[in-house]
Amino acid sequence: MNDIKVAVLGSEGVGKSALIVRFLTRRFIGEYASSSECIYRKRMSIDARQLNLELHDPCSQPCDGKSTLNEQIHWADGFVVVYDISDRSSFLTAKAIVHLIRELHLGATKRDSDSVIFLVGNKQDLCHMREVDREEGQKLASESRCQFYELSAAEHYQEVLLMFSKIVRNASLGSKAKERRRRPSGSKSMAKLINNVFGKRRKSV
């Protein structure tokens, strides 16, 4: 049975844990905060294959855990990078995260690189407060070779289910190639840049 590891990344308050809990339980949690590391596990059947899924939200760790983000990027088979469409700063953070992942995966094959990152604009139900146009998200995803979704964890269970199912499928296809190669360790300068991006975050919603 294959183990698939997916990291869910993004700024504080963009709805990372809400998306995960919605996927796992169908329930929507409007406010969520944790001072401890959160790893969610689920057994799935994808294309008649049994998979053990681990969903990791490193943003739920305490402040001193942010230095492990570099390790999480190497650890994961797939990435869900989330921003809030009503918060432009969260979009800029998501853009920085995507670029960091790409820098660390320069040696990846194009197929694996294309399928591993999903850029998700959350809180579509707040479109009346929109600060990030859908076209901006699509443009970033296209330029960075990401899959793109814009949805609402509060209102769109089926879209959340589809998004997670698709990234698990894509990550499972890429994980065999990943096992055959040794990823290079992140540089100190890259780790410092990650810390600069995430230095002010404390809790995840």
Swiss-Prot record:
GTP binds at residues 10-17, 57-63, 122-125. It is an enzyme of class 3 (hydrolase). It comes from the Eukaryota. InterPro entries: P-loop_NTPase, Ras-related_GTPase, Small_GTPase. Its EC number is 3.6.5.2. It holds the Pfam family Ras. Disulfide bonds: none annotated. It catalyses: GTP + H2O = GDP + phosphate + H(+). CDD domains: RERG_RasL11_like. GO terms for molecular function: G protein activity; GTP binding. Gene3D superfamilies: P-loop containing nucleotide triphosphate hydrolases. Keywords: GTP-binding, Hydrolase, Nucleotide-binding. Residues 1-205 are annotated as: Small GTPase-like. Binds GDP/GTP and may possess intrinsic GTPase activity. Belongs to the small GTPase superfamily. Ras family. This is Ras-related and estrogen-regulated growth inhibitor-like protein. It comes from Danio rerio (Zebrafish). The lineage of its organism: Eukaryota, Metazoa, Chordata, Craniata, Vertebrata.
